[in-house]
Each structure stands twice: as structure tokens, then as C-alpha cells.
A protein has these predicted regions:
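The feature encodes the CheY-like receiver
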Residues: 22, 65-66, 83, 95
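Charged docking surfaces used in two-component/phosphorelay signaling
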Residues: 23-31
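Short hydrophobic/Thr-rich beta-strand motif most characteristic of the beta2 strand and flanking loop
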Residues: 33-40, 48
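Active-site beta3 strand of CheY-like receiver
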Residues: 53-60
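Short, glycine/charged-rich "phosphate-handling" switch motifs in NTP-dependent
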Residues: 108
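C-terminal output helix
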Residues: 115-124
Length: 139
């Protein structure tokens, strides 16, 4: 995928099993000028990524049914076509080890729930301008 396509895509993949959180995230993403592809579990996010790499970013809940956010990130970092997609990990867990695991796996930013609109918008903007999303996970 060319860098021109990378910059022009306006879609963000959102995976969270909480319907209220999905609505919250989607509404803010829309206000920021992006379209959302929204799923309620990790397995569905994985299926989408297997056939569609045209996303500006991914926002994944840490704990979801079937496949966790960390597993999605690990998969993305093994696929060259997905490595350019920056990822925000969100979690209700306030655990520094969990945060560290997210960054080691390849997350670009980490946001702990609960968060407010301003916190999410700021983190989203950081995510969308981050140029280090293509880093590879150490083997």
C-alpha cells in the first residue's frame, strides 16, 4: 500500500465488547473526521484485518471475547501490510505490566478506562500523527 493511500484513508477499526463504549468511541472518531468499522469482539477484528488493511488506525479493548487486543496487535505486527497501522489499546485495568506488554506487542498508545472525551481526543490525535507505528515486535 502506498504512503499516499496510508494518509488518505479515513477509516478506523474499533473493537470493543461494550456497546456503550463502542458508541462513545464511534461518535468521537466521527467528530474527528474519520469513519469507523466497528466490531464487538477480537475475532471479528482479526477476520477483517485478514482481508482489509485500509485503516488509518485501530482502537482495541484489551479484554474481549474470543481474541484479546494484545493478540490482534501481535498478529498485525507479523503482517507487513498491517505494520503501518498505529494502534490504541484501551483497558479498564490500571496495571503497569499490562501497559508495558501492550507497548512491547506493538501498541502505539494506551488509554486507561474510564476516560473523558478530551482524554480520548488527545490520545486519538497522538495516535493519528504517530510515525513509529511500523516498528516490528522483537522475536
Amino acid at each position: 500500500m502506498s504512503s499516499q493511500t496510508d494518509q488518505s484513508t479515513k477509516r478506523i477499526l474499533i473493537a470493543d465488547d461494550d456497546p456503550v463504549m463502542r458508541h462513545f468511541l464511534t461518535s468521537i472518531v466521527r467528530k474527528e473526521g474519520y469513519d469507523s468499522v466497528v466490531v464487538d469482539d477480537g475475532r471479528e477484528a482479526y477476520r477483517i484485518l485478514q482481508s482489509d488493511a485500509d485503516f488509518r488506525a485501530g482502537i482495541f479493548d484489551m479484554i474481549m471475547p474470543h481474541l484479546e487486543g494484545l493478540d490482534i496487535i501481535r498478529y498485525m505486527r507479523t503482517e507487513k501490510r498491517l505494520q503501518r497501522i498505529p494502534v490504541m489499546m484501551i483497558s479498564a485495568e490500571r496495571d503497569l505490566q499490562l501497559m508495558a506488554k501492550s507497548f512491547v506487542a506493538g501498541a502505539t498508545v494506551f488509554l486507561t478506562k474510564p476516560f473523558n472525551i478530551e482524554q480520548f481526543q488527545t490520545t486519538l490525535r497522538i495516535l493519528l500523527v504517530n510515525k513509529t507505528a511500523t516498528r516490528k515486535v522483537p522475536q
